[in-house]
């Protein structure tokens, strides 16, 4: 069977069976059908908000999913595609659909998509290029398991969690973790990680390694206390206005609320990011030390890497 045709009066199809036809190349729908429409041989809902079926033997190498698509039905619609090489997903999906066991070589995931779902690209053994734009928040378990041709991937800022075995049995040897990730679940020990220092290494009873964000609070004369970074509910400046002399330095200090309770002491800056509005007036280091370069004013923004919470300090250089 190479073609499947939906007549005008048909309002329901056995989609699970339809998506199991290995030889299917094209789907056609009568123009006056009330439930479905087809475009380039692909089956959608009448309003084109749902993708129902992409023929497994469709000869096209490139598929740009229409931006109108908000949902891909879980009837193996994009699984085990034989000829598709380049896939661009709709920006209006909430998560990536299942595309496992397909011939895909390149996939583009728009930043509006919240996450890469569990096993989405499992066993896509020709997949060698993954483009992810900023906005992705999570990658679930085994998302790229057995993608042996995948040798590198750039993870975007804003990513918060990486699940179990996401990059197991891929070609990835090194991986840079952005400074927004809160947790990396069990990861292949053979992968060399370049990660933020606030991600601490832990071992499960099984011996599996995982990483989790920790926030350290230091108070004068007391032992430093460490909390899960996910418990931070607010950060604020010790002082919101600073005046320094040209050529002099001072260090910004951050107060922190854990589970809505203000703690004594100051937050270790390793989990913070510092930026200045005027680099010619004020220089700021990764540890929060500011230096007055010339007379003027600047605003230093302090951001909690894991959630994006911020506060601002107004700096005047005399």
Where are these regions (language model features)?
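Non-catalytic beta-sheet/beta-sandwich ligand-binding modules that flank or precede catalytic cores
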Residues: 208
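Consensus positions within tandem repeat domains that build extended binding/scaffold surfaces
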Residues: 75-76, 117-120, 141-143, 163-166
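Extracytoplasmic soluble-region selector
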Residues: 156, 228-318
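Hydrophobic structural packing positions in well-ordered secondary structure
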Residues: 43, 121, 211-212, 274
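Structural signature of tandem-repeat unit edges
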Residues: 1-41, 46-71, 79-94, 102-115, ...
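Small side chains
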Residues: 107, 114-115, 165, 237, ...
């Amino acid at each position: 069977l190479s073609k499947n045709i939906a007549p005008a009066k048909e309002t329901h199809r056995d989609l699970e069976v339809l998506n199991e036809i290995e030889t299917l190349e094209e789907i056609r729908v009568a123009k006056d059908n009330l439930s479905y429409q087809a475009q380039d041989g692909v089956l959608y809902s009448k309003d084109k908000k749902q993708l129902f079926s992409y023929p497994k033997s469709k000869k096209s190498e490139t598929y740009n999913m229409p931006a109108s698509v908000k949902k891909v039905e879980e009837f193996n619609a994009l699984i085990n595609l034989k000829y598709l090489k380049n896939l661009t997903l709709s920006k209006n999906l909430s998560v990536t659909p299942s595309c496992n066991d397909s011939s895909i070589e390149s996939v583009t995931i728009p930043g509006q998509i919240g996450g890469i779902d569990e096993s989405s690209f499992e066993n896509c053994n020709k997949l060698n290029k993954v483009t992810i734009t900023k906005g992705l928040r999570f990658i679930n378990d085994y998302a790229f398991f057995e993608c042996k041709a995948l040798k590198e991937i750039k993870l975007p800022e804003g990513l918060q969690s990486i699940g179990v075995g996401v990059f197991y049995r891929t070609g990835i040897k090194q991986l840079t973790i952005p400074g927004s990730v809160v947790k990396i679940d069990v990861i292949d020990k053979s992968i060399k990680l370049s990660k933020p220092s606030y991600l601490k290494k832990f071992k499960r009873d099984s011996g599996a390694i995982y990483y989790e964000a920790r926030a350290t609070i230091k108070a004068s004369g007391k032992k430093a206390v460490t909390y899960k970074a996910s418990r931070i509910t607010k950060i604020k400046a010790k002082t919101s206005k600073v005046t320094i002399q040209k050529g002099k330095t001072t260090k910004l200090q951050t107060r922190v609320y854990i589970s809505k309770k203000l703690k004594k002491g100051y937050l270790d800056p390793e989990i913070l990011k510092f930026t200045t509005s005027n680099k010619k007036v004020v220089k700021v280091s990764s540890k929060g030390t500011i230096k007055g370069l010339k007379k003027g004013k600047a605003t230093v923004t302090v951001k909690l890497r894991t959630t994006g919470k911020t506060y601002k300090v107004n700096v005047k250089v005399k």
